[in-house]
Amino acid sequence: PPSYYAKLYARHNLRGGHIIKLGPGNDEAAAYALQEWPNHLHIGGGIHLDNAVSWIERGAEKVIVTSYLFPECRFSLERLLALEKRVGRDRLVVDISCRRRGSEWIVAMNRWQDLTDMRVSKGAYKRERERG
């Protein structure tokens, strides 16, 4: 169970380990794992504006988000800024897991099945850094 790994991470002082909820019925196990090493693990999977603070309160050091930021597979800066305002930049991890399409790398979500409108490149990274 996830709590086993949380205890293992705590024993070896591994900070920032990820708990990813991939499917329904994972909330209870994830919450239990967070209790095993509070404020040292990151949680992702179904994170959105209305539940992010709850996961921080349950013991997550940070929340990991992808799908919420891409309604209909299109990046929403407004959603990112709202989530950042709600939990704080230091508590937010934006997952930009990608799949290759031709010669490009595209941010993917929903278990890498859905490609978004965001391409990952040095230029895109530079633009986002300049924004803030």
Protein language model features and the residues they cover:
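N-terminal active-site wall of soluble small-molecule enzyme domains
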Residues: 2-42, 46-56
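Conserved anion-binding
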Residues: 56-132
